[in-house]
Amino acid sequence: ICTNNCAGYKGCNYACPLNDHPIAYKSCEGEFDPKSKCPR
């Protein structure tokens, strides 16, 4: 389930955190998007 974990951070809306990489985020399509990074 994808939810907005980075409200207020540009490019981080509707991202899924990766359990093995808390700073990196996956897009809701399920593919890693290097642009969708934000603080936890």
Curated annotation (Swiss-Prot):
Keywords assigned: Disulfide bond, Protease inhibitor, Secreted, Serine protease inhibitor
Cysteine disulfide partners in this protein: C2-C16, C6-C28, C12-C38
Gene Ontology molecular function: serine-type endopeptidase inhibitor activity
GO cellular component: extracellular region
Site (Reactive bond): K26, S27
Subcellular location: Secreted
Chief localisation class: secreted
Stated family: Belongs to the protease inhibitor I20 (potato type II proteinase inhibitor) family.
Function: Inhibits chymotrypsin and subtilisin strongly.
Name this polypeptide is given: Proteinase inhibitor IIB
UniProt organism field: Solanum tuberosum (Potato)
